[in-house]
From Swiss-Prot:
Protein name as it appears in the record: Small ribosomal subunit protein uS8
Gene from which the chain derives: rpsH
InterPro entries: Ribosomal_uS8, Ribosomal_uS8_sf
Quaternary organization: Part of the 30S ribosomal subunit. Contacts proteins S5 and S12.
TM segment ranges: none
Gene3D superfamilies registered for this protein in UniProt: 3.30.1370.30, 3.30.1490.10
One Pfam family matching this protein: Ribosomal_S8
A cellular component term, taken from the record's GO annotations: ribonucleoprotein complex
SUPFAM superfamilies associated with the record: Ribosomal protein S8
GO molecular function, one term: structural constituent of ribosome
Purpose of the protein: One of the primary rRNA binding proteins, it binds directly to 16S rRNA central domain where it helps coordinate assembly of the platform of the 30S subunit.
């Protein structure tokens, strides 16, 4: 069975594991998912990620980050652009998540960037997700 929206599946797995206070979460890997994981790591939402060879395909494993008394680093995740309704933003009209406290992940011609990086480079693109 094919998956209609692998990014939404990734975000749902991370959200569910985060809410259940799991230490790690695994999922099928792709270049796009690995790039999203890299952005989450750069922004401090996860500890680390690894891509491992499985019997069939590759597996992406994220190590979730918690502070002090198991307080979650990720308060929320939201898929913005969906297969049925794509959402694009110009470089002059990029969204800010919670007034700059969160991160918008944007797919641009220069690869996946955060909203701040895209603003600095002056590029727009498809708004994939919000993380706060």
């Amino acid at each position: 069975m094919t998956m209609t929206d692998p990014i939404a599946d990734m975000l749902s797995r991370v959200r569910n594991a985060n809410n259940a206070h799991h230490d790690t979460v695994s999922m099928p890997s792709s270049k796009l998912k690995a790039n999203i994981a890299e952005i989450l790591k750069q922004e401090g939402y996860i500890e680390s990620y690894t891509v491992e060879d499985a019997k069939v395909g590759k597996t992406l494993t994220l190590e979730l980050k918690y502070t002090g008394n198991r307080v979650r680093s990720i308060a929320g995740l939201r898929r913005v652009s969906k297969p049925g309704l794509r959402v694009y933003a110009k470089s002059t009209n990029l969204p800010q998540v919670l007034g700059g406290l969160g991160v918008a992940i944007i797919s641009t011609s220069q690869g996946l960037l955060t909203d701040r990086q895209a603003t600095e480079k002056g590029v727009g693109g498809e708004v994939l997700a919000y993380v706060w």
